């Protein structure tokens, strides 16, 4: 599926595979904002501008664009690529980018691979039990420094107890 970007392109706006927006969801044309599946934004896990046609990203972009159109000074810097699917009776979830050092575990039923560098979680691939994948997604989206939590515990048994008491309260 390719987004229809002709409207913005025809009036001189910057485009690539999608409409280029900045961290305030503004296009290259002053006072014109865009949000959703046809926008390219910065993937915080890789630093690259890309299309990420995903509901959570579109929702947050819409909030950002709406706030800025109403005069606020709001920044959206939490876009990450994510996918989740059920396949052959297994749940599969991925998020972020697959670069950096690797933590890997597999027990025959479940598979987990975490990618991290520069004291941050960059991405993950989980097959099987994806119940706690939201914790990893939040760590990526919030750019949480890994030295502020028990990273070994987060890798093996993700849960709120791995976070400092300050973060949990």
Where are the model-predicted features located?
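C-terminal auxiliary extensions adjacent to catalytic cores
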Residues: 108-167
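An exposure/low-complexity boundary signal
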Residues: 61, 65-68, 160-169
């Amino acid at each position: 599926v390719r987004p229809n970007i002709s409207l913005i392109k025809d009036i001189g706006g910057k485009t690539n595979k999608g409409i280029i927006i900045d961290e305030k969801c503004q296009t290259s044309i002053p006072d014109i904002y865009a949000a959703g599946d046809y926008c390219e934004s910065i993937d915080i896990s890789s630093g690259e501008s890309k299309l990420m046609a995903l509901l959570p990203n579109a929702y947050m972009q819409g909030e950002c664009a709406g706030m800025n159109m109403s005069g606020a000074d709001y920044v959206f810097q939490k876009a990450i690529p994510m996918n989740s699917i059920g396949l052959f009776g297994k749940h599969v979830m991925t998020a972020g980018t697959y670069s950096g050092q690797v933590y890997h575990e597999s027990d025959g039923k479940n598979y987990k691979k975490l990618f991290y560098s520069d004291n941050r979680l960059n991405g993950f691939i989980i097959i099987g039990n994806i119940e706690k994948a939201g914790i990893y997604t939040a760590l990526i989206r919030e750019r949480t420094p890994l030295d502020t939590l028990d990273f070994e515990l987060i890798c093996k048994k993700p849960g709120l107890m791995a976070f400092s008491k300050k973060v949990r309260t």
